[in-house]
Amino acid sequence: MSKVLPKRSDDYSLWYNELVKRADLAENAPVRGCMIIKPYGYSIWEKMQAVLDKMFKETGHSNAYFPLFIPKSYLSKEASHIDGFAKECAVVTHYRLKNDENGKGIIVDPEAKLDEELIVRPTSETVIWNTYKTWIQSHRDLPLLINQWANVVRWEMRTRLFLRTTEFLWQEGHTAHATKQEAIVETEQMMNVYATFAQNFMALPVHRGIKSANERFAGAEETYCIEALMQDGKALQAGTSHFLGQNFAKAFDVKFASKEGSLEYVWGTSWGVSTRLMGALIMAHSDDEGLVLPPLLAPIQVVIVPIFKTAEQLDLIEATLKPILAALKAKDISVKFDHSDKYSPGFKFAEYELKGVPLRVAIGARDIENGTVELARRDTKEKTTVPQEGLADTIEKLLQEIQENIYKKAFAYREANTFVADDYTTFKTMLDETPGFILAHWDGTPETEEKIKEETKATIRCIPLDVTSEPGICMVTGKPSAQRVLFARAY
């Protein structure tokens, strides 16, 4: 198969789909809308998991696991919550198959109908809050800070690998608190954890903000979010954190005895990120040659490709590299020494470029004589010849520079593609001619928000917390507006 990718400028969607497949990240599964995450793609997700899990534990959270199947009656206890997910729920109605009487296959056994249908987990608030009813009795049981790593199912109609799939992997945090203020602090803290992860590890600049009522999570009183801009000018929601108030506590009768002895409902939060982050990572940084991975999340940070003609030359290269490989390992730098003779060095160069390996080292017989190696950066494609002496230190410094440069490039793109619109005509022109984030005034009503969405396909991504904005007048109605909000067309 040709490794030449479609160009982003020609067909961004095709470029993305082809890159995911050709870089061996994922492929479509037999069940429509599901995906198979391949080893290379899963290794990136594992690195994300490891970093996030450490951050969660540093903020006092513990991991647990709750069932995949949820009794249908649980979902009906929180009306606004089920309204938000009803159309996406997969339902289990029977528990057994049997052979067809004609001997031509298997069928669902009609006698094995469940007394109560089970919902395949679209999210776990209901089953977790039903459990919290037995776990929480006293103020001494609070705060309860739980996270789970799991798969969920939402029956999506329009799917795309990593970005929107019927089944996806994620983490979901669910916490319970004695006071409203503690729960709000937790909600904001987890939004900030996600933003720190996105910026420091994914090299992805994000806006922190609050969702409008129309875009709020079903069952939440407030939804905080982080929003990123992809290279085609579309926004992507990279993480959400929800202040649930006492909605789920009241629905599932979760009370605690306060220090004063009175019975009170707890306050809740939930928050999550998913394999959608993989899509964000790919679309934010990659180019027409393939993936561009930030070193902190790259499964292979450095690949060493020896250039040799004889076994003796390879032996000499391996002997030269032995202390260098040991030094890199001591620095916890992930390195692959690809000395296989199945493919030419040129093929390997192209393959590792496609897979986004941040730094490539080439070493041949002449380099051995000169005491040098050639380094090639994936982010800038710059090649340099450097001494073998102190190479591990050189590589360590260069990986830090690459991480920072990838972020700076993404930040510069976002800033160059963030616009201000003062009237609706300009707003619509910007959406069509210069896609990106648009800061504009909105009167705060769901009706105006829905009108904009219907007419332009743009949504309020968030009411930004990190953008200074003055009061003004709504670009559509002319009514007063407290501040500019962030609009974009989005994934």
UniProtKB/Swiss-Prot annotation:
Matching SUPFAM superfamilies: C-terminal domain of ProRS (SSF64586), Class II aaRS ABD-related (SSF52954), Class II aaRS and biotin synthetases (SSF55681)
Q: Where in the cell is it found?
A: Cytoplasm
Entry-linked CDD domains: ProRS_anticodon_zinc, ProRS_core_arch_euk
Tell me, what is an example of a GO biological process annotation in this record?
Answer: prolyl-tRNA aminoacylation
What is the superkingdom listed in this entry's lineage?
Bacteria
Annotated GO MF terms = ATP binding; proline-tRNA ligase activity
Subunit structure, interactors included: Homodimer.
Keywords for this protein: Aminoacyl-tRNA synthetase, ATP-binding, Cytoplasm, Ligase, Nucleotide-binding, Protein biosynthesis
Pfam families, sorted: HGTP_anticodon, ProRS-C_1, tRNA-synt_2b
Protein name from the UniProt record: Proline--tRNA ligase
Primary location recorded for the protein, binned into one broad class: cytoplasm
Where does this protein come from, organism-wise? Answer: Cytophaga hutchinsonii (strain ATCC 33406 / DSM 1761 / CIP 103989 / NBRC 15051 / NCIMB 9469 / D465)
The UniProt comment on domains reads: Consists of three domains: the N-terminal catalytic domain, the anticodon-binding domain and the C-terminal extension.
GO annotation, cellular component aspect:
aminoacyl-tRNA synthetase multienzyme complex; cytoplasm
Q: Which family does it belong to?
A: Belongs to the class-II aminoacyl-tRNA synthetase family. ProS type 3 subfamily.
For this protein, the Enzyme Commission number is 6.1.1.15
Return the broad EC class: ligase
Q: Which reaction does it catalyse?
A: tRNA(Pro) + L-proline + ATP = L-prolyl-tRNA(Pro) + AMP + diphosphate
Q: What does this protein do?
A: Catalyzes the attachment of proline to tRNA(Pro) in a two-step reaction: proline is first activated by ATP to form Pro-AMP and then transferred to the acceptor end of tRNA(Pro).
Q: Does the keyword NAD apply?
A: no
Supply the NCBIfam families for this chain.
Answer: proS_fam_I
Q: Which InterPro entries did the record assign?
A: aa-tRNA-synt_IIb (IPR002314), aa-tRNA-synth_II (IPR006195), aa-tRNA-synth_II/BPL/LPL (IPR045864), Anticodon-bd (IPR004154), Anticodon-bd_dom_sf (IPR036621), Pro-tRNA-ligase_IIa_arc-type (IPR004499), Pro-tRNA_ligase_II_C (IPR016061), Pro-tRNA_synth_II (IPR017449)
